[in-house]
Amino acid sequence: MDWTIPGILNQYGQHLDAAMRAMFEKNVLPEAGQQIIEVLLQNPGKRIRPALVLGTHVAFGGNVEDVLPLAAVVEWIHTASLIHDDIEDLDHFRRGAPSIWNRFGVPYAINAGDQILASALAHIANTPWPSKPRLKLLQRVLLELERMTVGQQMDLELERKGVSFEQYAKLCSGKTGAI
């Protein structure tokens, strides 16, 4: 097996795509919500985070099918954070295409980011994993979401004031490092 990020995604990328799509198959989203999810699925990012989840699990002898829901959740949470970040930073483009807020409008983008986060948390809560590890995972994800939002708040504040190296390192740890 090729243990690089591209190698892991080459091996398991289609499984990840299916798991990500499955998270929204049972949701009855209005048309715009469905369009946003489809746009996001058709224009994926590098998917480093889910590749790390999948690769680590398989490297330690786990079955990839057991961890696909978590890998999908991690990527959706990251995607939701990017939707919100693009609004806050007024970024018109993401991944070479119009950002979600630029394409659908700010209200739809905010709602899509919130919907994705809620669906990700519900997906964890409803997985068939044993209760204790599922609760620990949910607690950890909520803690990291809190760290991520604090990091984003720091980013917004530091844009106004300027930033030292220590502040920037702390900001990165919160924003991108949290998830």
Question: What are the residue ranges of the model-derived segments?
Answer:
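Mg2+-dependent prenyl diphosphate-binding active-site environment of isoprenoid biosynthetic enzymes
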Residues: 24-179
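N-terminal amphipathic/basic leader segments beginning at the initiator methionine
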Residues: 1-24
